Amino acid sequence: MNDTITAIATPNINSAISIIRISGPNTYEIVSKITKKEITKTGYTFVKEFIYQNDLIIDEVIILKYVAPKSFTGEDLIEINCHGGVLITNKILDLILESGARLAENGEFTKRAFLNNKLTLRQANSINNLIFSKTDIATNLSSNGIINSNNDFFLDIKEKIFYLIGKIEVNIDYPEYEDVEQVTAKEFNLEVKEIIDKLNKTINDFNKVSYLYNGLNVVIVGKPNVGKSSLLNSLIKKNKAIVSDIKGTTRDLVTESINLEGLLLNFIDTAGIRESKNKIENIGIKKTMASIKEADLILFLIDDSKKIDKKEKEILNLIKNKNYIIVKNKSDLKVNANSELKGISISALKKDVKPLVNEIKTNLKQGDFNIANNLAICSDNELKIIKQVLLVLKKSYANSLSGFPLDLLVEDLKVAYEKICTIMGLSEDLNIIDKMFKNFCLGK
């Protein structure tokens, strides 16, 4: 990190103000060049100066000064607040680059903050989650990850693995000492199995509540022409899907997202499930079946003005082990032909969907919010690493059960240990760190 980086930190659009961020050892020297005035690290924390291109003034800006280590990145850092035209902002950026800085990579400012111990990896990931949050709930969870950055869960896992590695290596290096406690295969298996169980639980917890970050996938299924597209349009209050009396008009999956009291719901209207000789329609039906498997919640829509038929009973059987709500459409006709089925009555045509919205809210488990607030994993990046750790430990556990000597298994433990250290920000493996920060914003 001996070079100086720069990037536009605000959207590259015409606006009132733009911010250009510069960080690194030559920050003050570079800004002094483009202002034709020495910008010192002492004095006021912000100054008003002109930016020059040769001898021509191109903008009057506010310069915010941060001196290492008291900055976001832990380095000398300056933020130039200029007028927000795209042309002028990029002109100033070009001047900074010509004066010795290089364009930052995605997430490089945050990566430097992490490498300079200004942030934990958990805090860095939570900041990225916060930037991309689409609901109040996701924002609150991300903020919680920034504030509560402890690594207690991973510290416990790390220490257990380190303890095992240490005992095995002592046994290998000093077999002649009888007073050194010997690690048995039974002890090894118990310890590793305990770690595997803990990792499985935290992965399951993350998967259970990931919808709070990414949104709940709500799939609308039913026979053709029962009002699925009308229901979708009523829920999202737009005319998104094709509404027609012709069967099979929704041949592909139609997706729209809404913010329901702080929770993101991704509604998917699917092709009607029926026997069809139309190849294109059959593709849509296959996609519907795939969506059902991935759905967090299924809205099974029926026409309640007539009894459900054989095909609808097959659909009901298909989703019986999923999280679903039976939605009885056409309540305005007041027939209620399927009174034996427990469901929510609505009229998609009259946009009377409030009872369904209330049921969806009730369907969400309050306990999930408690799990989310105490998650050990806070990002997909961490999830990927934990899965890698789990894979290595499962391999080691299986090999131990098969009779492998422990000295052959210690290398697997070292791999797992290093990956846990990566999550905690203790790893020197910069390749992994680079990959994690590539998903961040430019200028962040």
Swiss-Prot record:
Annotated signal sequence range: none
Compartment list: Cytoplasm
InterPro entries (alphabetical): G_TrmE, GTP-bd, GTP-bd_TrmE_N, GTPase_MnmE, MnmE_dom2, MnmE_helical, P-loop_NTPase, Small_GTP-bd
Pfam family, one: TrmE_N
Disulfide bridge map: none
Cofactor list: K(+)
Enzyme class: hydrolase
Positions of GTP binding: 225-230, 244-250, 269-272
Domain of life, source organism: Bacteria
Keywords: Cytoplasm, GTP-binding, Hydrolase, Magnesium, Metal-binding, Nucleotide-binding, Potassium, tRNA processing
Residues reported to bind Mg(2+): S229, T250
UniProt domain TrmE-type G: residue ranges: 215-365
Family: Belongs to the TRAFAC class TrmE-Era-EngA-EngB-Septin-like GTPase superfamily. TrmE GTPase family.
HAMAP family referenced in this protein's UniProt entry, alphabetically: GTPase_MnmE
PANTHER family attached to this UniProt entry: TRNA MODIFICATION GTPASE GTPBP3, TRNA MODIFICATION GTPASE GTPBP3, MITOCHONDRIAL
Primary role: Exhibits a very high intrinsic GTPase hydrolysis rate. Involved in the addition of a carboxymethylaminomethyl (cmnm) group at the wobble position (U34) of certain tRNAs, forming tRNA-cmnm(5)s(2)U34.
Name the UniProt record assigns to this protein: tRNA modification GTPase MnmE
Species: Malacoplasma penetrans (strain HF-2)
Phylogenetic placement of the source organism: Bacteria, Bacillati, Mycoplasmatota, Mycoplasmoidales, Mycoplasmoidaceae
